[in-house]
Design a protein with these regions (language model features):
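Bacterial Sec-dependent N-terminal signal peptides
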Residues: 1-5, 11-40
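Short glycine/acidic-enriched loop and turn motifs that connect beta-strands
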Residues: 46-50, 100-102, 139-143, 187-189, ...
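Residue position within the beta-strands of beta-propeller blades
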Residues: 42, 95, 135-136, 182, ...
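A short beta-strand motif characteristic of beta-propeller blades
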Residues: 64-78, 110-116, 158-164, 197-204, ...
Length: 352
C-alpha cells in the first residue's frame, strides 16, 4: 500500500497551489457495467481534504470504465474524504473512508445501506466470520506514542463492538489458521490476533512493514520497508503461520524504495509487487527479480491488482494527484492491452 505519510506531505505541497477542485457530473450507469458480473472496483481516493472520494468500475465485458459509480447510485453524494480500500462480503461492499473516519456499506449496485462511524483513521477491513470484522487504523510516525486500536466490527448490526489496543500504524491484515496477521507501518513487528477471542501476540520482523498476502501453501508474505538512514534494504519475508516464525527472507537490494503494493495470483503461486515498476516473482524463488516486467516510465504507478481468474494485470496511475487518473491493463506476460480513465488518485482495487 502506498505509504500514506508520503502522500500527506505530497498533498501539503500540492495544496499550496490548488485553487479549485473539479466536480464531475456523475454519468448514468450503463446496465451491465456495475450490475452483476465480473468487474474491477477501483477506489478513487480523491484529494486529501477535498471530500471527493469516488468509485470507478471497469467492466471487462464491454471494455470500459464508469466513473463516480457510487455518487450516481446515491443522489450525487460523495463517499467522503480519502477512500482507502474496499472489501466484499455477503453481496455487500465495505468502503473504508480514511480521513472521514468511517466505513460505508453498500449493496452490489453501490446503493448505500449504512454508515459506520467512530474510527480513528481507518485503513483496511478484514471479515473473519459471519458477524465479525477487524478494522486497522493509522497513526502517523510523528505520533508514534499515541494510543491506537484495532476496531472490532459487528457486521450484523454495523456497529463497533470492541477496540483492541495495538500501538502504531496498523495496516493490512490476512487470516490463517484461526489467527489474523496485522502489518504495522511504524513498528518492527507483525501482530497476531486470535480471531476467536482477540488475544494478541507478535512476530519480530526487524523493520516496519506494510503489505501481506497468503500463498498456495498457506504461507504469509510480508513486505518490510527500506530505511536509507539505517542502511536497511527493503525485504520480502515468508512467515510460517503454524509456528509463527520467519522461514525465508529475500532482500530487494535497495535502501531507497519500498514495496507499495503486494498481490498474488489466483492459485497463490506468483507474487506481484509495485516498487516504482511492476515486478513478478515465483513463491519458490530464492532471490528477487532484478528488473520489473512493466516499467513505470513517465507514469505515476499507484495501485496494483491481479485478476485471480486469468492473471490479467491492472495498474493504476495517479497522474498529478489532482486530475482524473488512469488504469492500465496488461496480460500476465506484461503485454499491453489498454488504457482507461478513472477518478482522482485511483488506488486500491478489487476484482469482484
Amino acid at each position: 500500500m502506498i505509504t500514506r505519510v508520503k502522500i500527506y506531505f505530497l498533498f501539503a505541497i500540492i495544496g499550496t497551489i490548488m485553487v479549485s477542485c473539479r466536480k464531475d457530473t456523475p454519468p448514468s450507469l450503463p446496465q451491465g457495467s456495475v450490475n452483476g458480473g465480473k468487474r474491477l472496483v477501483i477506489c478513487d481516493e480523491g484529494g486529501f481534504g477535498y471530500n471527493n472520494a469516488a468509485v470507478s468500475v471497469y467492466d471487462p465485458t464491454n471494455n470500459s470504465t464508469v466513473i463516480n459509480a457510487y455518487a450516481a447510485a446515491n443522489s450525487n453524494q460523495s463517499l467522503g474524504d480519502v477512500l482507502q480500500s474496499v472489501t466484499e462480503f455477503n453481496d455487500k461492499y465495505y468502503f473504508v473512508v480514511n480521513n472521514s473516519g468511517k466505513v460505508i456499506v453498500s449493496d452490489k449496485n453501490f446503493v448505500r445501506l449504512a454508515t459506520i462511524s467512530g474510527f480513528i483513521s481507518p485503513r483496511y477491513i478484514l471479515v473473519v466470520s459471519n458477524n465479525k470484522a477487524y478494522v486497522s487504523n493509522l497513526v502517523l510516525p510523528t505520533n508514534a506514542n499515541q494510543t491506537n486500536y484495532i476496531q472490532v466490527l459487528d457486521i450484523a448490526t454495523n456497529t463497533i463492538s470492541k477496540s483492541i489496543r495495538l500501538d502504531g500504524w496498523t495496516e493490512q491484515m490476512v487470516q490463517s489458521y484461526g489467527k489474523v496477521y496485522v502489518t504495522n507501518q511504524n513498528k518492527k513487528y507483525v501482530y497476531v490476533l486470535d480471531a476467536l477471542n482477540d488475544g494478541l501476540d507478535s512476530i519480530y520482523v526487524g523493520s516496519t512493514n506494510a503489505c501481506i498476502v497468503k500463498d498456495a501453501n498457506e504461507k504469509l508474505w510480508v513486505s518490510c520497508n527500506a530505511s536509507a538512514a539505517n542502511n536497511v534494504s527493503a525485504r520480502l519475508i515468508r512467515i510460517n503461520p503454524i509456528a509463527d516464525t520467519i522461514e525465508a527472507t529475500i532482500s530487494l537490494q535497495t535502501t531507497q524504495n519500498s514495496i507499495s503494493r503486494l498481490c498474488i495470483n489466483g492459485d497463490g503461486t506468483t507474487l506481484y509487487y509495485l516498487m516504482n515498476d511492476v515486478y513478478k516473482m515465483d513463491i519458490n524463488a530464492a532471490v528477487c527479480p532484478t528488473t520489473g516486467i512493466i516499467a513505470q516510465s513517465t507514469h505515476t504507478f499507484y495501485g496494483l491488482c491481479i485478476d485471480p481468474a486469468d492473471e490479467t494485470i491492472y495498474v493504476s496511475d495517479a497522474v498529478d494527484y489532482n486530475s482524473n487518473g488512469k488504469l492500465y491493463r496488461y496480460q500476465s506476460n506484461a503485454n499491453y492491452i489498454g488504457t482507461y480513465t478513472t477518478g482522482i488518485i485511483p488506488g486500491f482495487m478489487l476484482m469482484d
